[in-house]
Amino acid sequence: MLENNVKYEYTKTPLDYQITEYDCGTTTLLNALRYLFKRSEISPKVYKYILQYTLDKSNIFGEVRKGGTSVFALEFLCDWLNENAKSKEMNVKCTSIPKDDISINNKFLSDKIKNGAVAIVKLYQDCDHYCLLTKLDEEYAYLFDPYYLNINYYDNDKDIEIIKDKPFEYNRKVAKVRMDSKSKKDFSIVTNKDAVIIVIEKL
């Protein structure tokens, strides 16, 4: 029998997928922590707080939690992390990009991502949807989309590729021109009053 010499890194966990139609915000914020921190570094109190304050919206029919997570809730949680995470033994900083400056080509965003930070980005995908930005190059953005899809879902879209072999990093490769297209196409950045990009970095 051949000896298995592969060494695995068990200190972090793979990024995760949402388990309902509504928890993309919850899952993406937790994925930011999964990406940045070792499992042993993530405070259970922070985890519980995120679960408690996301999924705060009702839908147009008044059904509680079925409106997903509001921008207000995400910004509230990020402010709370800035104030309290250190006391919970997690050194993390969250920064919201001003709405007028929201773009995949924002220099502050690019610099932070290149230095190991991540960002929660609100995108269009049939409806408003949160994904985690983890990497950028000249032409493409690399994101983890918490909504699980078949590998061939975007075969007819030249701007989007589904990636299946980077579970700790990303699962979508998206052309930056698509993200800044100000359209209703998948992965176009939301630019209305609910637009949001929140940069999250480990200090």
Language-model region placement:
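Generic short alpha-helical segment signal, independent of protein family or function
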Residues: F37, D79-K86, T191-V199
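Alpha-helix N-cap/loop-to-helix boundary motif
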Residues: G62-T69, D101, Q125, T191-D194, ...
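Active-site-adjacent structural segments surrounding the nucleophilic cysteine of cysteine proteases
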Residues: M1-T69
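Papain-like cysteine protease catalytic cores
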Residues: I50-K99, I104
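General structural signal for secondary-structure boundaries
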Residues: E41-K48, K66-A73, D100, I104-N105, ...
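Active-site-adjacent substructure of cysteine-protease-like catalytic cores
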Residues: K93-Y148, N152
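Noncatalytic regulatory segments and standalone regulatory/sensor domains
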Residues: I113-K114, L136-L203
